[in-house]
Amino acid sequence: MRFNEKELVFLSRQPTQRAAELGMRGPKKGDVVKKRFVKLIVNFLFYFRTDEDEPIGALLLEQCRVEREDLQVFSIVFLDEAERKYLFECDSQEQCAEWIDAIIKASYEFMRKNLVYYRTEIHRLTGKDPLEQYGISDETRFQVNSALPPLPPPPPPT
């Protein structure tokens, strides 16, 4: 996926969900761990040289898996490129757990699944589709997946 560099730089300056200096090792063989300032903004993980204001890279946190590798180390692996693995070293186990949790929750897919879940719950409790008022209830991206029971059809108008 291609991105406009100026837009990414602008996005990298927005308020962060999480930011810290972490050890980071890239996906190439022979890459070594380097201190990087890492910022989580929406579903992007930006990384900077510690003395610079513009990011040297960004990871789009979609279609990836986040795993704890060690007590203070986690990795990000992209599902379509298993060899593309990034390692991050934290200062503590707690910091590592917080980063893993934040990154998992940053993805569009996580947010979509939550929306579908809460939509189903609201519909179950009230009998109303909360998305109907916005005219988006029939959009595929908001449909219930096979893990959840399907929404019953709306009641006929009275």
From Swiss-Prot:
Pfam families: PH (PF00169). It comes from the Eukaryota. InterPro entries: Boi1/Boi2-like, PH-like_dom_sf, PH_domain. One of its GO terms (biological process) is retrograde transport, endosome to Golgi. It comes from Danio rerio. Residues 15-108 form the PH domain. This is Pleckstrin homology domain-containing family J member 1. GO terms for cellular component: cytosol; early endosome; recycling endosome; trans-Golgi network. The lineage of its organism: Eukaryota, Metazoa, Chordata, Craniata, Vertebrata.
